[in-house]
From Swiss-Prot:
UreD, UreF and UreG form a complex that acts as a GTP-hydrolysis-dependent molecular chaperone, activating the urease apoprotein by helping to assemble the nickel containing metallocenter of UreC. The UreE protein probably delivers the nickel. The keyword Cytoplasm applies. Required for maturation of urease via the functional incorporation of the urease nickel metallocenter. Belongs to the UreF family. InterPro entries: UreF (IPR002639), UreF_sf (IPR038277). Pfam families: UreF. It is found in: Cytoplasm. Keywords: Chaperone, Cytoplasm, Nickel insertion. This is Urease accessory protein UreF. GO terms for molecular function: nickel cation binding. It comes from Pseudomonas entomophila (strain L48). One of its GO terms (cellular component) is cytoplasm.
Amino acid sequence: MNTDLALLRLLQLASPGLPVGGFTYSQGLEWAVEAGWVRSVAGFAAWQREQLHDTLGYLDWPVLARLYRACQADDAEVFAYWSRFLLANRETSELRLEETQRGSALARLLDGWQLGQDPAWRNGLELSQLGGMAWLGAHWAIPLRDLALGHGFAWLEGAVMAGVKLVPFGQQAAQTLLRDLGEELPAVLDHALVLDDEQLGGGLPLLAIASSRHETQYTRLFRS
């Protein structure tokens, strides 16, 4: 696949129009706002920066790299292992449900294209959105670094749009957050791509608490 087409496929995977329900989740932010943990643009930036450096840097991106390489090597067993590892590191039932819902949605998209139909791959694809992104990234010859940055920006954009509704703040602040937090993505990715297996795993106690409390939050806009 030529580089122009690979770029277009990456934009498709990173698009908010990808039918995986990206903007229906806040990943605990909704309860953090209600609890008073996040009250301002600065508070939101600090909340997301923690997740960027911990969850993205030590879990999502390193796992994405391993999933991608498993796809390149046509190793469904390794792919399934890291898919299960990712799901096991989602610390609440709500976050695990979000992961499998996103994964199933992307797997259904692959079904429509008659891709990833081998049961050895299909079962792993249903476990996480990262699995589907890795599979399509390898299939479409999207370079790993580009794929990871596209995924990271899509994650950040979804979080900022949730913040617009919840904190709240305006579009100027939203774009400034995307600009400023986005500048940190390449350095975090550099570190994520050189981690050894035993260094992987995310753990943010406040995020886990917020997600747990959100499960029973009386009035809410988001599914997580």
